[in-house]
Amino acid sequence: MAIGFDEHQPLHTFQEVVGLKQPLFAQKLILCFAFHSVFICSFLNLRSSSINILSLENFRFSTIHYFSSMIITKTPFRISFVGGGSDLESFFSKKKGAVLSTTIDKYMYISTHEFFERDKIRCKYSQTETVNNVDELQHPILRTVLKDFDVKGIEVSSIADIPGGTGMGSSSSFTVGLLHNINAYTDHEVTKESLGAGACRVEIDLLGEPIGKQDQYAAAYGGLNIIEFHPDGSVQVEPVDISQETRAELNANLKLYYIGNQRSASKILAEQKKNTSQEDKFKALEKMVDLVYDLKEVLVKGDLDAFGDLLHQNWLLKQSLAKGITTPRINDLYAAATQAGARGGKLLGAGGGGFMLFYVDADKHSDVDAAMAELDATPFEFKMETEGSKIIHVES
């Protein structure tokens, strides 16, 4: 990109020349000056202190060329084993909630790059939007985050390994990855805690989504964790330390199947939130929280037969929380898998569709695969991951 200027026009600082309100991450300029017909070029960093071009009395400013940075973040999706629903404020404001979850090696990738048209914003996801004003963006998370950071002249793109609405916390992985990226783009340092809290602020406080807090913290921290939600609103993340043998068994024997029927979690969660005031629903959530600590114990011991049983108990409780969590097809799939040898399982996410997870002993894999194939459920390979959201590329 090149911007031409009248060589006789008075100029002040480089920031004023480019019209930037804040420094960009690792932004560099090549500045070319004419001095008695000889061009002198030098590299300067925009983040350095302002320089008054007028003090260079014998020089004439010619052209600025942008060599801007590209930043890419990689943020994992999550699988929640037990406790889902207790991360809603309607529950944890009255009694501590908890979930036990892991992130997996499927990711949301967010890239940012300076946009050619400095007075516009371009966002590419399942659609492409190019707007003059951030308020014109249709994507609510992009609109909220970019407005919050007051950035313009930026191009944001997203690519995901898994589609949204499938029960793996894709919206929160998007939000965490976007916050991580834009903080880097604007030269702000972040922690895992600030990413989790920031994503909750965007999705729950600013956008008013009727969702819980587990997905945001899972994506930010990564790994196998108990995530606790306290009545004062604070969140605590406790890693679950398991042996390499247990981790290998989980990676080998956790079976994931895509059953289709992508859905919006918001409707089901809104009903679940409303139902929390009912005594039987509240007690079901209390039992699910208890299962979190039971599951931690069996994982630490390496008792994975009991792990499957606890998944089954959690699924029975979860179905009672709201209509729409399960469907006749989901019930048929669950019955087919358990009859073929699965020790236990669950539907991922709020309910209605997406992915089903089962724990299956090695000698029963082919039987369960065959049973699920008969009902048009597609196996999906994955492994547990440990890193959480991270920056994987910076190009100056």
Predicted regions and their residues:
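Short, often N-terminal, low-complexity regions
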Residues: I3, P10, V18, Q22-L24, ...
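DPxDG-like acidic metal-binding loop motif
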Residues: M168-K192, A220
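Short, Lys/Arg-enriched N-terminal segments with co-localized hydrophobic residues
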Residues: N52-S69
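C-terminal nucleotide
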Residues: M70-S80, D87-S90, V99-S101, D105-D150, ...
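N-terminal basic, low-structured, amphipathic or hydrophobic segments
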Residues: G4, V38, L46-I51, F61
